[in-house]
């Protein structure tokens, strides 16, 4: 089936589902408004959203229609783009990825005019900034993610190594532990695994390397292409030096789960991944249970900084909604401290409200979450906001340039110089 036809089917199915999946209020007898919300696909996230929408419905007397959308995030985006381009108000509240605001901003309500400033100020500033396009706040944060470093506590202790503070420390420790274990007969062990496949995950890893060295964010906040600089080159060169040295060549085709599989099976000393991998590494049947530490990603040298690429999801309101006031109220409710606390306790989602990282109930359920506060505070956003509708092209060019360097097809200097020229043409000299 052609892509256009498939999206048309998905679009029709989504709208049909709106009509049959109403969550009715108990009182009052006549609802004040009817609001439709796209709750993601099946599973814990969908159930969490549906339960929250039902609670809001009972609290306000409004009626809610819950919509299930495709599981694949790219198909979700395509569906929303098709719906919004038609100026359809069929779905009032939509859940969007942190890199979508620039792509969808023209179709979304400016929430800075609808939501009190003190409510907005509760959230991590970096996430609010990522959701702000052209001075308009187009989404409220629901939960967040950022890259982390996982390490084998037992192996570092065995070889007298401390958790690394810089990427250079990590490179040295990975080599020492890897060589020592291989001499002892563990020839499957590697020093580090990460997301090295040519896809969005490599853009996240590459941005972390570059930003930790002080090499910028590919494109700065004013739209200028900044990727071709000595610090960025040094960062990518260091990562390239890992391949076949302390990282398997196969890492060039690893996404999140391949990296987690290698690490959790006991075949890596270090791993870069998202917070979700923690609970899995500590499962009762996990070979690494009780052996794993987690920390902020290392600095790019003494003058560098800890960082982690910002991830997560947010709630936005369709500009073409016929029930804007009620839709905004639902978005506020779904991103409230109460709902974020429930999400943290029930499904271990990471709140976007710093105060919740000290909440006793959340910490009792998930002690690990308290260690994430500094990571989310220092998270770096991908340049999706400033590059707008061209972000996907920017990211693709970046991950391909990094992948070519990691695979040895070109040197970092050559790759980033070529990337700079490509992005400058794409940006029309900074005018995205």
Task: Describe the role of every protein-language-model region.
Residues 55-125, 130-132, 154-165, 262, ...:
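Extracytoplasmic "Venus flytrap"/periplasmic binding protein-like
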Residues 97-146, 162, 187-188, 202-205, ...:
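Hinge/lid segment of periplasmic solute-binding proteins
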Residues 276-289, 300-400, 429-431:
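C-terminal lobe and pocket-closing loops
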Residues 32-43, 62-68, 92-93, 138, ...:
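Short, well-ordered beta-strand elements
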Residues 34, 63, 157, 377-432:
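Conserved C-terminal helix/tail region of periplasmic/extracytoplasmic solute-binding proteins
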Residues 174-176, 221-252, 297:
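Glycine-centered hinge/linker elements that transmit conformational signals in sensory
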Residues 138-142, 147, 171-224, 268:
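Extracytoplasmic/periplasmic solute-binding protein
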Residues 112-123, 129, 182, 190-199, ...:
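Short, solvent-exposed loop/beta-turn-alpha elements that line the ligand-binding surface or hinge
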